[in-house]
């Protein structure tokens, strides 16, 4: 997979961070690495004041570094900021951060030594992953997490995990992989540590997970609509044109396509004049969720292909300047927004499960119990659905903000973007489980109703039934639910 600093997407990130894909640098990316490093070398040679290169960091930004300090400042930068606290982040999250950092190096703004950038790439390709604690970033760059990653990658300390999940001292793991870290020069320590790539990487994984969650929501909402015997008029394109939300129209189009061939597409075959909101307004809620996710994807894609460096090299201007690009309010706010969209979709999903379980509303056996056996059917699963929804709603609460107390008042703002992105990703995972529960309920309702399904919903029903047979007698369903998560 070739990185170029411009075209990394959430779906590509999710793939390369998990499946062992080797990364390469594009020719133009290599050129940008060399050109940006030349600007840094010139600033050092001429002792031009550059934050974190020829001066100290944070509250020491006005202090010039001596010649003696310059030689070891990159190592000192990593050693002094490697404080990320356990529990450790999942391997995929750290590898996502590594991939984003490699990609953003190629913008030319970091000024990192090409040898250091290539060493990080080789460590990634060797399947080695730093052990990085999940606590330590406030979203004004992911400094402590980045330092922990950088120190391990350079063999200065910490631990690396290999493809077989064996954990070793970083220096030992590099030696076993026949990798020799290059010497760090000026700016290199800060380039490895001071960036927002953990936040962007986590958010990229969250968007990829949320896309799967939302597509599942849409498909299973259509199956529930069929099982319920819903009134199709709220999905009519002429009705939706009265309020021109494009995402609503797209969701409705996908649901109508899934229902193609159903007798319910003729409103005369609906069982009710007006359905419960969870059925009637699925399009509006899922459309709003899709819009929030689209905005998140746009912001995250920008962040994964942009510099979050401070300072940053302006290659064409031959300058190094201070920036605010390490600060990530766009990322934090859009992750909060998208998580709320998932919460809204999941809330209606749980409501539809309850409606499908109601004999009064569906005409089907209470709690979808098989009438020949005499069990409580899906009644216990309603508790599970609400438990999952409670967890998701908690994750979807906006992340709190306050004035930061860092750097003696110089660094007095934060975003907590990483926490927002982490919550967003976990919310998407819970959303997929809630949808799996709805899938089981909808499949059971379709079986009990006994009507032929349209072609695409018949395929979906068959996929569900391939991993979770029709529920007749009581049986544990936890394993079924996890299997359904994957097939839908």
Language-model region placement:
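Generic short alpha-helical segment signal, independent of protein family or function
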Residues: 62, 78-85, 98, 102-105, ...
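Short gly/ser-rich anion-binding loops that grip negatively charged ligand groups
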Residues: 63, 83-87, 106-110, 286, ...
């Amino acid at each position: 997979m070739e990185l170029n600093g411009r075209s990394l997407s959430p779906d590509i990130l999710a793939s390369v961070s998990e499946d062992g894909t080797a990364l390469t640098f594009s020719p133009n990316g290599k050129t940008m690495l060399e050109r940006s490093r030349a600007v840094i070398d010139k600033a050092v040679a001429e002792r031009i004041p550059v934050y974190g290169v020829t001066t100290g960091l944070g509250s020491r930004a006005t202090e010039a570094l001596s010649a003696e300090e310059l030689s070891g400042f990159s190592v000192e930068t990593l050693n002094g900021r490697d404080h990320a606290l356990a529990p450790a982040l999942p391997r995929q999250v750290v590898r996502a951060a590594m991939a984003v950092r490699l990609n953003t190096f190629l913008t030319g703004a970091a000024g990192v030594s090409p040898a250091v950038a290539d060493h990080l790439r080789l460590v990634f390709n060797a399947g080695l992953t730093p052990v990085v604690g999940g606590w330590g970033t406030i979203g004004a760059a992911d400094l402590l997490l980045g330092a922990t990653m950088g120190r391990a990658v350079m063999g200065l300390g910490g631990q690396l995990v290999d493809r077989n999940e064996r954990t070793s001292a970083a220096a030992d793991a590099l030696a076993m992989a026949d990798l020799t870290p290059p010497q760090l020069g000026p700016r290199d320590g800060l380039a490895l540590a001071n960036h927002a790539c953990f936040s962007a990487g986590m958010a990229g994984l969250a968007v990829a997970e949320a896309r799967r969650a939302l597509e599942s929501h849409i498909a299973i909402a259509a199956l529930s609509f069929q099982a319920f015997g819903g009134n199709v008029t709220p999905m009519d394109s002429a009705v939706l044109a009265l309020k021109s939300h494009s995402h609503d129209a797209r969701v409705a189009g996908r649901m109508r396509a899934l229902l193609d061939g159903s007798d319910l597409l003729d409103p005369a075959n609906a069982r009710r004049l007006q359905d419960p909101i969870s059925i009637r307004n699925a399009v509006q809620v899922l459309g709003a969720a899709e819009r929030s996710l689209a905005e998140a994807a746009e912001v995250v894609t920008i962040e994964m292909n942009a510099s979050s460096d401070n300072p940053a090299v302006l290659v064409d201007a031959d300058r190094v300047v201070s920036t605010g690009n390490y600060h990530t309010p766009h990322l934090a706010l859009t992750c909060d927004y998208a998580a709320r969209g998932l919460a809204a979709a999941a809330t209606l999903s749980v409501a539809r499960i309850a409606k499908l379980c109601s004999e009064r509303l569906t005409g089907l056996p209470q709690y979808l119990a098989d009438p020949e056996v005499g069990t409580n059917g899906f009644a216990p699963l309603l508790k599970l659905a609400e438990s999952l929804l409670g967890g998701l709603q908690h994750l979807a609460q906006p992340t709190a903000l306050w004035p930061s107390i860092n750097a003696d008042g110089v660094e007095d703002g934060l975003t907590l973007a990483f926490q927002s992105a982490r919550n967003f990703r976990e919310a998407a995972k819970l959303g997929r489980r809630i949808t799996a529960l709805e899938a089981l309920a909808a499949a059971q309702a379709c079986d009990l109703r006994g009507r032929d399904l349209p072609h695409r919903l018949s395929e979906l029903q068959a996929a569900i039934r391939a991993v979770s047979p029709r529920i007749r007698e009581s049986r544990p369903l936890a394993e079924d639910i996890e299997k359904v998560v994957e097939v839908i």
